[in-house]
């Protein structure tokens, strides 16, 4: 067997060469390199393959526009097939909506117009094609993991990097992802080096004029497509929109069409007229009884809830929501018009809490993510806070979901109790937290303040995706009238979750009644479940309707009416004689007047994107002050194990409680709300121990005071934890 001899590098010789290197040597090197490159290119041009491809390149250059049109159609079909996970579905889309298909193909065609600026036209075509195919592959993969398509918001959180990859890819898929990226990069480099070049003269001015013409033509075609309702600028459900209007249009709309464009007629004078010269920003209570008692106001958003009695294609073995039906008969109720179908929980929240109409924002936009995550805005919390209410938000899901922890801080809440501050023992068969846990936390929030409270609760139990397999072996409620077994299983799972959500609603009312405090409780559904419902399946014949009811112990008159989500808060305020919050006052005074909606658009623009003329320099909120959680996490003692490790005993631990020793996170095991074990940590005298309530992406929501460990005992260092009198956000960002 031959031995492999590795030549020892001549480092000393290389250093000597560098020392003696002259300018002429460098010039000679690059000149030789250029000549060598020219010879290689010439050889490739004269190669057998190049000679065979010359007629192809010549044909492609002569009929390049036709070629681009065909290529755009092929790419469009390919990305739709990948997105829909079916060639058949892509064909049905193409033949069923030919104008939509051609519009999206035209968008891709326009992007190919830039190739005329380059000699390496084949390579530029490849780059553009790869870009569109990556979008299609990303969307198709995302839809295997979730119901929301790939959109601009995913790009905005791409900085999360590893956490995002770990969320959607397992180990094998990460390897495939890396191999795929490397393969594409290698192929593109190869095509850059070996691809043919355009031999003619590049007319940059003509090319730029052509690009401008294509862009102008695209704008014209887009306006016509919207006017003729080929596509829409409003997405009630972003997943359905991608199916109806295609990936290219919907993705680009999510990138470029966000926020509210400045409406015509926007000016200081106009806003002074709409603001009624300052009256809209006033805060007052005109009802004497309300002024005296200040009733608690509770809003409960029920995930994917609607009254299943409104579905006409199946029946249930018993009443699915007896408690809510009882309330429907006695208290004000009706259909609740929401901005989305099958998804978009945060957008219903947004309309309810701010009084803003989502229709004026970009298609498929989530203002929580695009605006309120980083900017303050008045809301029901600020409106009631001005009147002396304590304001609290609760949700039995992660605090970072939809950026709620930052959003609620920016819209004026005093506290937010998320999943990280709850001991959730009951989960659905799909792994979502059940809503029963919320009752005690709502009571805790109300008990945390001396004054009466506004509590906004977002439930979770009804969340999809709904299993096609029979996962509840002995369901309390069964479904009949559905022949498809998979669909029947989905509805049977759903109605049993709704039944338990109804039990939660009933138990909450019982808990409120025990307090014997004047209270109003509003229950409503955020959107219909993701079940592929059609308008003809429902009694209301409308997919944007859920249900609401306003329970009270004040003796309010029953007044049934259908109401959109952006008006519900002002409706409740008006019945109580509360006039606070610019948009809520606007709805109360202008709801049935001329130009109500057009002036609402102006008002929303002025508040979020304009010069805030309506506030006249007195903005309702300039910074947040919200704390995360209600209860303090405390340590009482530490007990060493017989072999190694320790048990920490204290109060209010949850699964999100992480132990830090000297500011370093430890491996720990949560056992219950009073005990956490440290199996591998060795404590020394003087060590500082703290408990952090940690969210996703290692977000520090709240930190306990530090405890000094000495001789088996703990001494608290008061004032070393999160300052709950100030906003949690800058403190967490400082820790990061």
Regions found by a protein language model. Give the residues of each.
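Membrane-interface segments at or immediately adjacent to transmembrane helices
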Residues: 221-299
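Residue-level preference for non-acidic, small/hydrophobic
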Residues: 161, 297-303
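Solvent-exposed soluble domains appended to multi-pass membrane proteins
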Residues: 282-290, 302, 307-736
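Transmembrane and membrane-interface helices of multi-pass
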Residues: 35-242, 685-688
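N-terminal targeting leaders characterized by basic, low-complexity, disordered sequences
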Residues: 1-38
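Exposed alpha-helical structural elements
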Residues: 10, 25, 157-160, 323, ...
């Amino acid at each position: 067997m031959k031995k492999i001899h590795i030549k020892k590098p001549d480092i000393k010789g290389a250093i000597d060469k560098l020392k003696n290197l002259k300018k002429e040597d460098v010039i000679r090197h690059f000149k030789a390199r250029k000549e060598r490159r020219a010879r290689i290119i010439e050889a490739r041009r004269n190669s057998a393959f190049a000679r065979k491809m010359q007629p192809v390149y010549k044909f492609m250059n002569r009929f390049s526009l036709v070629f681009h049109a065909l290529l755009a159609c092929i790419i469009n079909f390919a990305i739709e097939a990948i997105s829909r996970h079916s060639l058949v579905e892509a064909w049905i889309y193409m033949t069923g909506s030919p104008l939509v298909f051609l519009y999206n193909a035209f968008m891709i065609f326009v992007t190919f117009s830039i190739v005329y600026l380059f000699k390496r036209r084949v390579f530029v075509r490849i780059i553009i094609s790869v870009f569109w195919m990556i979008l299609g592959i990303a969307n198709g993969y995302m839809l295997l993991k979730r119901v929301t398509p790939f959109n601009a918001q995913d790009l905005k959180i791409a900085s999360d990097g590893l956490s995002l990859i770990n969320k959607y890819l397992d180990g094998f898929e990460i390897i495939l992802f890396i191999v795929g990226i490397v393969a594409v990069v290698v192929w593109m480099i190869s095509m850059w080096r070996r691809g043919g070049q355009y031999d003619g003269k590049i007319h940059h001015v003509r090319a730029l004029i052509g690009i401008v013409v294509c862009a102008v033509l695209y704008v014209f075609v887009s306006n016509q497509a919207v006017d003729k309702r080929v596509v829409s600028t409003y997405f009630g459900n972003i997943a359905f929109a991608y199916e109806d209007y295609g990936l290219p249009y919907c993705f680009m709309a999510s990138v470029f069409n966000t926020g509210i464009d400045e409406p015509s007629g926007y000016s200081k004078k106009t806003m002074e007229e709409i603001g009624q010269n300052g009256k809209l920003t006033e805060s007052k209570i005109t009802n004497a009884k309300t002024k005296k008692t200040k009733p608690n106001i509770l809003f409960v958003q029920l995930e994917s809830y609607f009254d299943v009695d409104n579905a006409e294609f199946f029946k249930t073995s018993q009443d699915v929501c007896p408690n809510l039906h009882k309330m429907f008969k006695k208290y004000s109720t009706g259909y609740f018009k929401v901005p989305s179908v099958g998804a978009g929980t945060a957008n219903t929240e947004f309309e309810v809490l701010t009084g803003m109409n989502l229709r004026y924002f970009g298609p498929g936009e989530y203002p929580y993510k695009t605006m309120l995550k980083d900017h303050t805005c008045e809301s029901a919390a600020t409106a009631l806070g001005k009147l002396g209410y304590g304001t609290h938000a609760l949700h039995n899901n992660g605090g970072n979901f939809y950026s709620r922890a930052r959003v609620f801080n920016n819209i004026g809440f005093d506290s937010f109790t998320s999943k990280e501050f709850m001991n959730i023992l009951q989960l659905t068969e799909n792994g979502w937290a059940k809503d029963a846990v919320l009752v005690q936390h709502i009571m805790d929030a109300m008990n945390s303040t001396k004054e009466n409270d506004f509590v906004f609760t977002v439930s979770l139990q009804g969340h999809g995706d709904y299993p096609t397999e029979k996962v509840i072996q002995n369901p309390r409620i069964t479904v009949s009238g559905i022949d498809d077994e998979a669909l029947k299983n989905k509805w049977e799972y759903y109605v049993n979750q709704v039944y338990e959500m109804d039990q939660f609603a009933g138990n909450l009312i019982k808990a409120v009644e025990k307090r014997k405090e004047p209270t109003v409780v509003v229950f409503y559904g955020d959107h219909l479940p993701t079940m592929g419902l059609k308008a003809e399946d429902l009694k209301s014949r409308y997919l944007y309707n859920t249900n609401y009811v306003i329970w009270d112990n004040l003796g309010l008159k029953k007044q049934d009416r259908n109401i959109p989500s952006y008006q519900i808060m002002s409706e409740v305020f008006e019945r109580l004689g509360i006039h606070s919050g610019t948009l809520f006052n606007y709805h109360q005074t202008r709801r049935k007047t001329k130009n109500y909606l057009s002036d609402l658009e102006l008002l929303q623009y002025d508040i979020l994107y304009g010069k805030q003329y309506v506030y006249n320099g007195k903005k309702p909120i300039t910074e947040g002050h919200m704390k995360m959680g209600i209860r303090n996490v405390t340590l009482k003692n530490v007990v060493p194990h017989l072999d190694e490790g320790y048990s920490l005993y204290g109060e209010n631990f949850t699964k999100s409680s992480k132990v830090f020793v000297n500011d370093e996170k430890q491996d720990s095991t949560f056992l219950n709300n009073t005990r956490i074990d440290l199996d591998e940590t060795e404590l020394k005298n003087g060590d500082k121990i703290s408990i952090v309530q940690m969210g996703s992406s290692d977000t520090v929501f709240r930190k306990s005071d530090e405890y000094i460990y000495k001789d088996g005992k703990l001494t608290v260092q008061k004032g070393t934890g999160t300052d709950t009198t100030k906003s949690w956000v800058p403190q967490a960002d400082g820790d990061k």
